[in-house]
Structure formats: C-alpha cells, structure tokens
Amino acid sequence: MLIKVKTLTGKEIEIDIEPTDKVERIKERVEEKEGIPPQQQRLIYSGKQMNDEKTAADYKILGGSVLHLVLALRGGGGLGQ
C-alpha cells in the first residue's frame, strides 16, 4: 500500500509498504529516498511518535495515510551515549 511521509519542509515522499512492515522498515525506506539515517528520524502518526518495533498495522495505517517526519536532535543522553 502507498503511504506518504511529509517532511518539515512540506515535501511529501511516497513509500510502498506492507501492513506487516515495522516502523524500522519504513524508516529504512525513507533513508533510501532521502538519505536520512533511521536513527535521526522520528515518525509521527496521529500525533504520536511511532515505535520502531511496532508495525504499520499496529498503528492502523492505511493506504493514503500521511506520516510526519521530524529529525531527532543530537545529544541529550540518548541510548548511544
């Protein structure tokens, strides 16, 4: 199914996903199209930040749904530090 990912600049990226795809996979598809590493991406759907381990179906994402992409700020004592 085709979904859209909207960036902060207003650009819309169209991505073909399966309902069983994890959010992590959606981020990989965004990286393929935009070159933004998954660890720097935060995907928002229905006002909630999406968990990498959940699937599109867990969030009830349907064809034509629009996700919002925001970039994670560096620093702040994240997991990798």
Swiss-Prot record:
Tissues of expression: Expressed in the CA1 region of the hippocampus (at protein level).
Modified residues annotated as N6-acetyllysine in this record: 48
Major localisation: nucleus
Interaction with UBE1C: region residues: 70-72
GO cellular-component term (any): cytosol
Gene3D superfamilies: Phosphatidylinositol 3-kinase Catalytic Subunit, Chain A, domain 1
Localization terms from the record: Nucleus
Keywords, comma-separated and alphabetical: Acetylation, Isopeptide bond, Nucleus, Ubl conjugation pathway
InterPro entries according to UniProt: Nedd8-like (IPR038738), Ubiquitin-like_dom (IPR000626), Ubiquitin-like_domsf (IPR029071), Ubiquitin_CS (IPR019954), Ubiquitin_dom (IPR019956), Ubiquitin_ubiquitin-like (IPR050158)
Cross-link (Glycyl lysine isopeptide (Gly-Lys) (interchain with K-? in acceptor proteins)): 76
A Pfam cross-reference name: ubiquitin
One BP term from GO: regulation of transcription by RNA polymerase II
Pro-peptide region(s): 77-81
Domain of life: Eukaryota
Gene Ontology molecular function: protein tag activity; ubiquitin protein ligase binding
Record PTM text: Cleavage of precursor form by UCHL3 or SENP8 is necessary for function.
Interaction with UBE1C, annotated site positions: 8, 44
Family listed: Belongs to the ubiquitin family.
Assembly information from the UniProt record: Interacts with AHR; interaction is direct. Interacts with NUB1; interaction is direct. Interacts with ESR1.
Function: Ubiquitin-like protein which plays an important role in cell cycle control and embryogenesis via its conjugation to a limited number of cellular proteins, such as cullins or p53/TP53. Attachment of NEDD8 to cullins is critical for the recruitment of E2 to the cullin-RING-based E3 ubiquitin-protein ligase complex, thus facilitating polyubiquitination and proteasomal degradation of cyclins and other regulatory proteins. Attachment of NEDD8 to p53/TP53 inhibits p53/TP53 transcriptional activity.
PANTHER family found in the cross-reference section: UBIQUITIN (PTHR10666)
Protein name: Ubiquitin-like protein NEDD8
Species whose genome carries this gene: Rattus norvegicus (Rat)
Gene: Nedd8
